[in-house]
Amino acid sequence: MTLKTPHPTRRTRSTRKAWVAASVCLALLHGAAQAADTSSAKQLERFSAQAGTPGQAERGRAFFTSRQGGEWSCSSCHGNPPTKAGKHASTGKLIDPMAPAANPSTFTDTAKVDKWFRRNCKDVLQRECSAGEKADVLAYLIGLKP
């Protein structure tokens, strides 16, 4: 004996569509919430606490715009001032503005902040940046206005 399943009615189809739409929205909201787990101010607090001293914008500006013994400075790719899109020095790839006032989503994902500081500091300095250097750069970037 075979059981026939009834053909879905319009109501069950619309209910199913509503559940799918709700699930997709929740997944997107969850992803957005995870991506924005912090703020640039919280990142500055974190690095200042690790360094044991508050970040200083003037030191950050000097660090950001100076070559650190190599060919590049931070501003080689991120621009000077970094309130507009930059361009990677070797690949030519466009880079979003670094200043939080010009790009509110910058420095809002802790994992990405750590990843990009690690990668970019190794490119510019051939080592990781210290917590104090990160705090200084963030203090400088947070103080910039578009």
Regions found by a protein language model. Give the residues of each.
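N-terminal secretory signal peptides that target proteins for export/translocation
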Residues: 1-15
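Sec/Tat signal peptide C-region and signal peptidase I cleavage site
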Residues: 31-35
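Electrostatic cytochrome c docking/interface patches
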Residues: 36-68
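Soluble non-cytosolic domains of exported or imported proteins
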Residues: 51-54, 68, 107-111, 127-132
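Gly/Gly-Pro-rich "capping" loops immediately C-terminal to redox-active cysteine motifs
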Residues: 54, 75-113
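C-type cytochrome heme c attachment motif
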Residues: 62-80, 136-139
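C-terminal capping alpha-helices of c-type cytochrome domains
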Residues: 114-146
